[in-house]
Amino acid sequence: MRVPRHFAVHLLSLAFAVAIAFALIEPVPPDLENATQDIVFPIDKLVHFALFLVAAVPWRRSLAVLGVRSPGVAVVVAAAVYGGLLEIAQGLWTLRDAEFLDMAAGALGALVAVGILKALAVRGRGHIAAE
């Protein structure tokens, strides 16, 4: 049986999507919930940002391999939609509240990842062109 050439990147993309779903829908342990209540900065927004920042890298590569015309734009839109759906699920199936800002933090994480990848690609091309 021959494994498709880009199977690993697609599998990694799926693994990140599943891991994010478990992380965001799983109830927060009461000890952790109580420990973070006094923190002024909303740590949950940082978690959403970081999860989608990391996941956007293989997602973008996977979409590029599939031939999506603008994989960066598609990743940001998909992250916003996926984050929104997860927030709805969180509000329906857990004791946690769905928050628009959590979805926005995830989309922003994906946007920053795409921006970093774009900057690295441009910088890499400039370096190659200079040689």
Where are these regions (language model features)?
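Bulky hydrophobic segments
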Residues: 1-101, 107-131
